[in-house]
């Protein structure tokens, strides 16, 4: 009887270990934030963060899949356990850090204004004139802009969009005067559309991977994974492929 009991215990533990190994971590991504995260023309999640996390998952021995999530609701989805992490160009902010745990920063970005290629506007005029500035809703740069606008008394109006590329389209269609966003999607637009980066605003931002606060062991894997990735030649390949820097 004792042998049977021990056999069942071993079987149970083995099953638990197999279940843990089979777990697929769900990464919530912004479906329209090139070049860090987006869904390509074939419907496949792509981008710098997607490729980086795929490499880390393989190296650290876990499985991952990438699922587009509305950016405004991405942290609530993480807390509700509908996704397991956010590796999608998320800026580390004190407000977000109250709700989630962040990895060590893996990238820095600045914020920029984008205008039509033939626009005569200057940065000074953006702050001084009653223009319309398009920004992605739920982003740290949009919050910074709204807060500073109230403090400084800037005359422009902020119009919010579901994504930065949507703001670019309205810029080209003449519905807004300026788009404001992180540098990477602005540079992506500048390469593909008749627009130009006009100048910078706000503060330099740091990107990190967000997980639930109780998932510290998983967070350690992410941090170790990025440490290994940055020491591997593949890191420079990713930068060359996606960021062109």
Where are these predicted regions, by residue range?
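Extended ligand-binding regions for polar small-molecule ligands
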Residues: 50-59, 117-132, 137-140, 209-245
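Short, well-ordered beta-strand segments
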Residues: 26-30, 132-135, 179, 210
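Bacterial N-terminal signal peptides
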Residues: 5-16
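Periplasmic-binding protein-like
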Residues: 31, 108-117, 184-227, 244-245
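Acidic, polar ligand-binding/catalytic clefts
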Residues: 58, 63-127, 194-202
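Ligand-binding cleft/hinge of the Venus flytrap
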Residues: 39, 53-61, 141-160, 190-191, ...
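Extracytoplasmic small-molecule ligand-binding "clamshell" domains
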Residues: 21-89, 98, 159-160, 234
